[in-house]
UniProtKB/Swiss-Prot annotation:
PANTHER family: UPF0173 METAL-DEPENDENT HYDROLASE MJ1163-RELATED, UPF0282 PROTEIN MJ1629. Belongs to the UPF0282 family. HAMAP family: UPF0282 (MF_01406). This is UPF0282 protein Saci_0277.
Length: 309
């Protein structure tokens, strides 16, 4: 089994788009990209816009030849109703989605999920809610968790975690659990016992606003527990890499991981590419070049639709 991070914060955008390939199927998880509409009081920089365009094209090309597309929830950095990535990626695909009716917050239940489903209806070969299901394709098993909260606060909604096993190894994609603050987050990880983990990390860039110090401490403690669970690799990338101080936030987790032989890295490190922490460095980007960005129409619609994730 091979997996490729396609778009993450360390690659320059808001996303967790991931390609997983086994000898049986090509699986694309959360084919979407976004940017922070405002960060440090500033709009997206042109470099961020250009990078988003580049990675959106990459996701599009990989999506066209995927067999399965999975949508773990309805935030715009995890699903795209056609704003940036063309909807023909869903043509003749098998699509698994987060249940749009149950364990879902109002903004996703009544607006985002219905809009997305309406826009792709008629394109997929099949489309079904995935929460709690297990499906098999040859020697490949895809296991979906029951809906778990998007972090500590259910008001942000719920997500599904995805475990893929090809009999040789298991990769687990946590989606947006914000560093696993709840038992329901880590219980699924423990039950699956993956070799490889892709996890988003805490919302430390919102410490003191949407995250308390006690909550952050709990999330770090739980992530330490997770890396003790027999992992070989943990890619920690997404929410936490929006924080300019992410290295100090993750230092305790990395120390525990090193002690048990687990390698903790970002998506860019996994790909052996230099990090492009563009959102975290937005102030510096504007200090070097403060010209307004040229925002494509689709991206402008996405940014005006709200952050969500």
């Amino acid at each position: 089994m091979e997996f490729t991070p396609l778009a993450f914060e360390s690659l320059g955008v808001r996303s967790q788009a991931t390609l997983v390939e086994t000898k049986d199927v090509r699986i694309l998880i959360d084919p979407a990209v976004s940017l922070a509409p405002r960060r440090f009081g500033l709009p997206p920089h042109q470099i961020e816009v250009d990078r988003l365009t580049e990675l959106a094209k990459k996701i599009y090309e990989e999506a066209k030849i995927a067999d399965i597309i999975i949508i773990t929830h309805y935030h715009y950095d995890h699903h795209d109703p056609g704003y940036v990535i063309p909807l023909d990626i869903y043509q003749n695909k098998t699509v698994y989605i987060k249940d749009p009716q149950n364990f879902i917050n109002p903004s996703q239940k009544f607006r985002r999920a219905p809009r997305f489903i309406k826009t792709i209806t008629g394109k997929p070969k099949t489309m079904e809610s995935a929460d709690g299901k297990v499906v098999k394709y040859g020697s490949t098993t895809i296991q979906f968790s029951k809906a778990v909260p998007h972090g500590a606060d259910e008001r942000l909604g719920y997500v599904i975690q995805v475990a893929i096993n090809d009999k040789d190894s298991t990769i687990l994609f946590t989606s947006d659990i914000e560093g696993a603050p709840k038992n329901s987050h880590i219980d699924f990880i423990k039950s699956v016992r993956p070799n490889f983990l892709i996890i988003d990390g805490p919302l430390s860039y919102l410490l003191g606003r949407a995250l308390s110090q006690d909550e952050l401490d709990t999330e770090i403690k739980n992530m330490e527990e997770v890396v003790r669970n027999g992992l070989q690799y943990a890619i920690i990338d997404h929410h936490v890499l929006r924080d300019p101080n992410y290295e100090s936030v993750l230092k305790p987790v990395k120390e525990v991981a090193n002690s048990v032989g687990c390698k903790v890295i970002s998506a860019s490190e996994y790909l052996r590419e230099p990090p492009q922490l563009l959102e975290a460095k937005r102030r510096e980007l504007f200090q070097r070049d403060n010209r307004p960005a040229k925002i494509p129409r689709g991206l402008a619609k996405l940014l005006s639709a709200g952050e969500g994730g």
